Amino acid sequence: MRRLIAVCAVVACAGLAAAGPAAAAPTWAPAATAPVHPGVQTLTNGGQCTANFVFYDASNNVYIGQAAHCAGTDGNTATNGCEAGSLPVGTPVTVDGASRPGSLVYSSWVTMQSGGEADAGTCQYNDIGIVKLDPADYGKVNPSIPFWGGPTGLTDTVAQGDKVLSYGNSSLRQGVTLLSPKEGLSLGQDAGGWNHTVYTVSPGIPGDSGSAFIDRQGRAFGVLSTLQIAPLPAGNGVGDLSRELAYMRSHGGPNLTLAMGTEPFRGPLLP
């Protein structure tokens, strides 16, 4: 929630694997009754965000993603992950539907700062945090995205004009989920592929930060990061998930597999 506000100008491949080792997926709770899933709210030191995707490792530990800036400490306008302050790895994160807090086990912001990252696009749009759930809650998790179903895979390419889908869960909507499903178009990628600019109805608002983005085939491609006022008012910046996960693995982060949804992907509602 901290970062997804109006900030001027900025204000993150087909055939890719599901990012991680070839491990058997855990047994998931039924989607209809699972209280923990993509789209639930997370709370980090008072900052509310929306969870994106579910992940697991070779030992069947279960994780859920949020934006790295959800643990930021420098306020809403601090968007450069190589400079902005962050709570440390190990910070507890409340995940709606879970009985116990999870733990922040990876932050792209913390990792970039400790490694001296200097690439401008990476610093601006590498915006993912990984929360390890408490084992007591593993049996409460389903990886399906509400309303849309999926994800069905992972892609690093969404061309200008391609359909995009998301599901946000800002507390500003006061529990009204009618506007949570989002459908729109990609306006193209920039920053060396790190950022997808998208326009959806309705746009992402504070509290939707971190929410999942998938393409018209249900493939995961991004994490909601920013609300832009230029060049297109109410457009959103979406960090590229494939690059975020590759960066995590190559910089000592957990080696995770993106969990596929158990529910069929319904596809876009509009042509």
Functional labels for PLM-detected ranges:
Residues 1-24:
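Secretory targeting and sorting signals
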Residues 9, 17, 124-126, 193, ...:
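Short, solvent-exposed coil/turn segments
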Residues 14, 41, 120-121, 203:
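Generic marker of residues within folded, mature protein domains
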Residues 139-149, 172-271:
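Active-site region of chymotrypsin-like
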